[in-house]
Amino acid sequence: MTVAERADIQIRVWGIPAPQGSKAVRGYVNGRAILGESSKAVAPWRVDVRAATQNQYTGPALSCPVSLCATFLFARPKAHYGTGRNAERLKESAPRYLTSVRHGDLDKLIRSTADGLSISAGGTLLEDDSLIVQVMADKRYCEEGELPGAYLTVTKLN
């Protein structure tokens, strides 16, 4: 495998990362349940992932095993900053990593993002998200100058 074949594909996604949770019953048709996403935030996040991929990757969809490295970025709450004249300064006690239940489990963030990369869900980077055979991910608060979203690196393994 040449260096060019092994080149990492880097995508910067801007938006609010949303976890893909369980499906919820939306109604019934002829006795069959109609399922939909339990979170309304998943669809906009997938659109953000698809748009970023379409704008930043122009190659053919990958059909080989890949590794996905993802860093999810979330806006910091006001409580992480000082007050008064220190309102723009980050408190020393402010955490770097996000552990809030409100923003979702890391595995569910990966699931929604991987779907946005795959052709089967309207993406353009992967033939199917089942091609992701290795994952490394973290979720953290934005640092100064960063906007919410994700840094994604996809590496061909074949």
Task: Please report, for each region that a protein language model flagged, where it lies by residue.
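Acidic, proline/glycine-enriched N-terminal capping motif
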Residues: 1-158
